[in-house]
Amino acid sequence: MHLADLIETTLNGMGYELVELERAPAGLLRVYIDQPETGIVIEDCEKVSRQLTHVLTVENVDYERLEVSSPGLDRPLKKLADYVRFAGAEARVTLRLPVNGQKNFTGILREPTGEAGAEKVGLEFEGKDGPALLEFTVSDVDKARLVPVIDFKGNQRKGNKQ
């Protein structure tokens, strides 16, 4: 079983989602997790770290150090489900190929539309001539992240369907 599949299966069984997996130099394995309904607290990271340590040992995975953390305020958007979940939130999107000479866009995500397998995501942004709409598929994206919203009053992120 591929490492990402092994970790994702383990996390799903625990009620968590694998956001991102990184293999860094010197044997460092970084796992970013989320829990759509409640978010992540330090106890979640500890619990997942203990479980993954056992699973990786049993599966004889070669690594020196394991880090488990939340995806952070600037969470990456990797899957179609991420775009659905964070519709209404502000995001930075970098496309693989330019559209009208531009690859980088910042705006408000719209809920994906279209038939299964051909869904288009919308991003409302401020263009040169006023408000504009960019439509793209998840495969068109080089990288996408939420724009951090820091609210010291404890309100939820706008668009987060939690």
From Swiss-Prot:
<dbReference type="InterPro" id="IPR035956">
    <property type="entry name" value="RimP_N_sf"/>
</dbReference>
<keyword id="KW-0963">Cytoplasm</keyword>
<dbReference type="Pfam" id="PF17384">
    <property type="entry name" value="DUF150_C"/>
</dbReference>
<dbReference type="Pfam" id="PF02576">
    <property type="entry name" value="RimP_N"/>
</dbReference>
<dbReference type="InterPro" id="IPR028998">
    <property type="entry name" value="RimP_C"/>
</dbReference>
<comment type="function">
    <text>Required for maturation of 30S ribosomal subunits.</text>
</comment>
<keyword id="KW-0690">Ribosome biogenesis</keyword>
<dbReference type="GO" id="GO:0000028">
    <property type="term" value="P:ribosomal small subunit assembly"/>
</dbReference>
<comment type="similarity">
    <text>Belongs to the RimP family.</text>
</comment>
<dbReference type="GO" id="GO:0006412">
    <property type="term" value="P:translation"/>
</dbReference>
<dbReference type="InterPro" id="IPR003728">
    <property type="entry name" value="Ribosome_maturation_RimP"/>
</dbReference>
<dbReference type="GO" id="GO:0005829">
    <property type="term" value="C:cytosol"/>
</dbReference>
<dbReference type="InterPro" id="IPR028989">
    <property type="entry name" value="RimP_N"/>
</dbReference>
<dbReference type="InterPro" id="IPR036847">
    <property type="entry name" value="RimP_C_sf"/>
</dbReference>
<protein>
    <recommendedName>
        <fullName>Ribosome maturation factor RimP</fullName>
    </recommendedName>
</protein>
